[in-house]
């Protein structure tokens, strides 16, 4: 069977993305046919910063139509509008290749959201771009590994705005889309307030969550969704034995336990997108950029998922 062709967007070149590309290429090449969306010159510069530890000549690259950012010992680990613009163009090209079926999937390396903002990119991140590009699809950010998966009802929004987003109709649509994509038989849904609201004592959001769960189960014809569960105990070992699938109303409530347990091996997947996309579950790690310290397990797992 022919190996799948995977487009790999470079992420922010001032972070660990290029180190991950170089140190992982031999393993990645065994799983798929990687196409690195980056100018070869930048990979050469990255390898020089990594003391020429890796082979660069055999990597299949595609130049990006964007000015080359500076990459040297004084720029690494720093936010740059040029690097932000370049990482966005690399990602956008990956989506274009996937849309035209020139690649089978895309793997996105970490971007810096502030760099995108400085480059006047009108999207918070990868998932926000995908939601705008594919508006007819209920795209869901899910992170996890085989032991634990967490779908995020809200992702990169301020915590103070989440309460207003919790509406029965929107949550029912989300829950049904999550179940359809994952085919999960049981999904545990985290509550929003302390003690899942304590029957309305601590806010009304959890009452809406309960109604959405009931309506979703009724639509499915079986009790798929459990909850809302008090989030402080939802990820206890006995709860995780019930199912690996969870839904969280907010970003950190769901991802804090996931990353505490499985940070190195988890990946980020865009459910319900018309293209196949996966990513690492970590950021640019500016603090260890070009020090040969980056753990590549999450990146390799993302590639394996796509391949």
From Swiss-Prot:
It is an enzyme of class 1 (oxidoreductase). Its EC number is 1.1.1.262. It comes from the Bacteria. Its main location: cytoplasm. Pathway: Cofactor biosynthesis; pyridoxine 5'-phosphate biosynthesis; pyridoxine 5'-phosphate from D-erythrose 4-phosphate: step 4/5. It catalyses: 4-(phosphooxy)-L-threonine + NAD(+) = 3-amino-2-oxopropyl phosphate + CO2 + NADH. SUPFAM superfamilies: Isocitrate/Isopropylmalate dehydrogenase-like. Substrate binds at residues 126-127, 259, 268, 277. It is found in: Cytoplasm. One of its GO terms (cellular component) is cytoplasm. PANTHER family: 4-HYDROXYTHREONINE-4-PHOSPHATE DEHYDROGENASE, D-THREONATE 4-PHOSPHATE DEHYDROGENASE. Homodimer. This is 4-hydroxythreonine-4-phosphate dehydrogenase. The lineage of its organism: Bacteria, Pseudomonadati, Campylobacterota, Epsilonproteobacteria, Campylobacterales.
């Amino acid at each position: 069977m022919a190996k799948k062709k995977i487009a790999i967007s470079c992420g922010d070149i001032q972070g660990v993305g290029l180190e991950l590309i170089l140190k992982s290429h031999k393993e990645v090449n065994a799983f798929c046919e990687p196409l690195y969306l980056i100018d070869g010159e930048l990979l050469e510069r990255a390898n020089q910063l990594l003391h020429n530890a890796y082979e660069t000549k055999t990597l299949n690259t595609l130049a990006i139509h964007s000015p080359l950012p500076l990459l040297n010992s004084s720029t690494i680990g720093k936010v740059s509008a040029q690097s932000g613009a370049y990482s966005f163009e690399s990602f956008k090209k990956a989506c274009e290749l996937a849309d035209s079926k020139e690649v089978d999937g895309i793997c996105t390396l970490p971007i810096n959201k502030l760099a995108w903002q400085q480059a006047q990119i009108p999207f918070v991140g990868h998932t926000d771009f995908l939601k705008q590009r594919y508006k007819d699809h209920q795209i869901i950010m899910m992170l996890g590994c085989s032991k634990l998966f967490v779908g995020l009802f809200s992702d990169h929004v301020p915590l103070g705005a989440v309460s207003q987003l919790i509406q029965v109709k929107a949550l029912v649509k989300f829950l049904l889309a999550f179940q359809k994509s994952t085919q999960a038989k049981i999904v545990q849904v985290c509550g929003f307030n302390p003690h899942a609201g304590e029957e309305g004592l601590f806010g009304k959001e959890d009452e809406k969550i309960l109604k959405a769960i009931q309506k979703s189960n009724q639509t499915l014809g079986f009790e798929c969704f459990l909850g809302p569960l008090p989030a402080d105990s939802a990820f206890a070992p006995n709860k995780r034995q019930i199912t690996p699938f969870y839904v969280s109303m907010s970003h950190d409530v769901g991802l804090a336990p996931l990353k505490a347990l499985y940070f190195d091996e988890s990946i980020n997947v865009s459910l319900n997108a018309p293209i196949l996309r996966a990513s690492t579950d970590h950021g640019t790690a500016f603090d260890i950029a070009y020090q040969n310290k980056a753990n590549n397990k999450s990146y390799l797992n993302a590639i394996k998922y796509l391949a």
